[in-house]
Amino acid sequence: MDRYQATFERLAAQKQGAFVPFVTVCDPNPELSLKIMDTLVKAGADALELGIPFSDPLADGPTIQGANIRALDSGATPDICFDLIGQIRAKYPDLPIGLLMYANLVYSRGIENFYQRCAQAGIDSVLIADVPTNESAEFVAAAEKFGVHPIFIAPPTASDETLKQVSQLGGGYTYLLSRAGVTGAETKANMPVGDMLAKLEQFNAPPALLGFGISEPEQVKQAIDAGAAGAISGSAVVKIIESHLNEPDAMLTALANFVSNMKSATQK
């Protein structure tokens, strides 16, 4: 059984949803980034969603763009990122680990090489933010060849046809957008997502995790009450990193407290 499926089944048995934090690997530097990822898991994260630093993150607001810049300034390369992820994989063999990234980074290594490297690092899924389902064939083929789940975004404005493609092509989980626009904790997630979830279920989609604008435990609870399998929080996590750059111990404590509070909101 794959790690996402095993995790969702374990959580369902415990009457819990999943809480999944997002960080950019190597933010603010490789050494501290490893401690950050470790802290997130120890504090109760059910899976990790990770960004590979990129100089032009289109769908991201200023918070995650800042994380990309810090990581690149610290000397981050995809190889360093894969190495750090491999260390987390070795320590947490059952943890689902996903990448959220952009097509340029995949193309620059060659599509097959990229997914092969993901498989070697123990990565379970890859979501390419700027590749819609109708342009995804070569990515999906390479992902499946190397046992990596392709993840797709179900946006709130999606047609039934798009949701059907997202459901059929995706594996692992479905990234359900709570609203259109760029990422950021300032802009609140807007429910209801019930209609979207009903359609995804009708099309037999992988379990849905709600993302974009999730920054408070109450929103996690709302997402799960609406029928989502869990919630992803990115900008709110990265903001904690950003506001404690000169005090790493306080940063790790604040991250642990945030994850712990968000995770406790997943209990049904």
From Swiss-Prot:
The active site is at residues 49, 60. One of its GO terms (cellular component) is cytosol. It catalyses: (1S,2R)-1-C-(indol-3-yl)glycerol 3-phosphate + L-serine = D-glyceraldehyde 3-phosphate + L-tryptophan + H2O. Keywords: Amino-acid biosynthesis, Aromatic amino acid biosynthesis, Lyase, Tryptophan biosynthesis. The keyword Heme does not apply. Its EC number is 4.2.1.20. SUPFAM superfamilies: Ribulose-phoshate binding barrel (SSF51366). Pathway: Amino-acid biosynthesis; L-tryptophan biosynthesis; L-tryptophan from chorismate: step 5/5. One of its GO terms (molecular function) is tryptophan synthase activity. InterPro entries: Aldolase_TIM (IPR013785), RibuloseP-bd_barrel (IPR011060), Trp_synthase_alpha_AS (IPR018204), Trp_synthase_suA (IPR002028). Pfam families: Trp_syntA (PF00290). Gene3D superfamilies: Aldolase class I (3.20.20.70). CDD domains: Tryptophan_synthase_alpha. Belongs to the TrpA family. Tetramer of two alpha and two beta chains. The alpha subunit is responsible for the aldol cleavage of indoleglycerol phosphate to indole and glyceraldehyde 3-phosphate. This is Tryptophan synthase alpha chain. It comes from Vibrio vulnificus (strain CMCP6). The gene is trpA.
